[in-house]
UniProtKB/Swiss-Prot annotation:
<dbReference type="GO" id="GO:0045259">
    <property type="term" value="C:proton-transporting ATP synthase complex"/>
</dbReference>
<comment type="similarity">
    <text>Belongs to the ATPase alpha/beta chains family.</text>
</comment>
<keyword id="KW-0066">ATP synthesis</keyword>
<dbReference type="InterPro" id="IPR036121">
    <property type="entry name" value="ATPase_F1/V1/A1_a/bsu_N_sf"/>
</dbReference>
<dbReference type="InterPro" id="IPR004100">
    <property type="entry name" value="ATPase_F1/V1/A1_a/bsu_N"/>
</dbReference>
<keyword id="KW-0793">Thylakoid</keyword>
<dbReference type="Pfam" id="PF00006">
    <property type="entry name" value="ATP-synt_ab"/>
</dbReference>
<keyword id="KW-0067">ATP-binding</keyword>
<dbReference type="Pfam" id="PF22919">
    <property type="entry name" value="ATP-synt_VA_C"/>
</dbReference>
<dbReference type="InterPro" id="IPR055190">
    <property type="entry name" value="ATP-synt_VA_C"/>
</dbReference>
<keyword id="KW-0406">Ion transport</keyword>
<dbReference type="GO" id="GO:0009535">
    <property type="term" value="C:chloroplast thylakoid membrane"/>
</dbReference>
<dbReference type="GO" id="GO:0042776">
    <property type="term" value="P:proton motive force-driven mitochondrial ATP synthesis"/>
</dbReference>
<keyword id="KW-0934">Plastid</keyword>
<dbReference type="InterPro" id="IPR050053">
    <property type="entry name" value="ATPase_alpha/beta_chains"/>
</dbReference>
<dbReference type="GO" id="GO:0005524">
    <property type="term" value="F:ATP binding"/>
</dbReference>
<dbReference type="InterPro" id="IPR005722">
    <property type="entry name" value="ATP_synth_F1_bsu"/>
</dbReference>
Amino acid sequence: MKISSLLFEISELVEKNVGYITQIIGPVLDVAFSPGEMPSIYNSLVVKGRNSAGQEINVTCEVQQLLGNNEVRAVAMSATDGLMRGMGAVDTGAPLSVPVGETTLGRIFNVLGEPVDNLGPVQNSATFPIHRSAPAFTQLDTKLSIFETGIKVVDLLAPYRRGGKIGLFGGAGVGKTVLIMELINNIAKAHGGVSVFGGVGERTREGNDLYMEMKESKVINEQNISESKVALVYGQMNEPPGARMRVGLTALTMAEYFRDINKRDVLLFIDNIFRFVQAGSEVSALLGRMPSAVGYQPTLGTEMGSLQERITSTKEGSITSIQAVYVPADDLTDPAPATTFAHLDATTVLSRGLAAKGIYPAVDPLDSTSTMLQPWIVGEEHYETAQGVKQTLQRYKELQDIIAILGLDELSEEDRLTVARARKIERFLSQPFFVAEVFTGSPGKYVSLPETIKGFQMILSGELDNLPEQAFYLVGNIDEAAAKAAALQAGGQ
């Protein structure tokens, strides 16, 4: 019995295309194959063996370049510790494939589609390759509709498009990941939608916190994992650049299955798209390509386009993508955020100044934009209210220098009124989050779009001029602000 199984393994190995490692430079391997047996670009190679300590090695690599002299250059998807020249590398004959479908919900995967949550293997036969073409023009859906998030500042001033691409821009520590967690929470609870979260090159601690948070809020159901609303794919900061560069594609592939086969609306979160570019830059340098502007890879636009063009709405379903974009040194002209801008339908820009004031979410109401904020899409009432809010805040911004030099008393009566309303608007744009209850001590609030519009209309019209501005801070709808004002008044007497 043992001899027959050994013969089977040997015959299987002979059938496979096996090369051997000739050079290892960090996560990059050069592999030599027999003449006429060269693997294709993006094929995955598997290196198995034992290191000098006798421990098993199993490293998957992706072919990136054909070098000539029957050699290929491949990038490893996991650590290359213990690999040696002369080790065998088996050509699988296909790109990386990952599990897809309902059984991925509630689970955490790595870039290879292997579960890393200690809950056992995925009971699933369906797999998709991570390299796929974008949908054809004829399959695309061009209908415009708003995606309500329950977050006042987003829904009013920079609404998201269903099936669109949204960028969350901000430097370190201004609240991008908290905003993403709130969106996952609101969408799962209010819309019953399925989400896929791609953790690309971020902190492992944040990934773990997000997982625990999702279990607490029942977005991931521990008792009945099949009722979970999200699949998680992580390629964190400690992973090699190959894994960080491809983990976004793994998450996108899982989302595409829900859209194309299950015909559902899906939310794809990528935190952080900058790390995808950064990993591509590292791989590009390791492959010996000449760097482009600011040291980025010359193929920056192509790599970004191949990912972004697959994120779209078809006649079968939609993928709405929300991408956190780390802005290096808060410089929006850096090639990485600038390239990302070109693909987005809406931008949510987070402001360090607002975060310093304690206004959360620290979304900049004047810098954030959306192609959806048009009167024929959102309606006249919404559009006029949003424009009124922006004009009031813009006037307040212009008056701030005068206030700093001369004080409020030197302003005209009209300008003093504008400043008072702008300060109320600024505070009313803050909102307690469900996922931040432990920090703020305030229960989270989901505010519907009609309630949001009504609240800001009342502030703009002057109906609430007699209420103190602190009554508008960290509340949900306008009724809560009025109740808070009454409580403040009662407390002050």
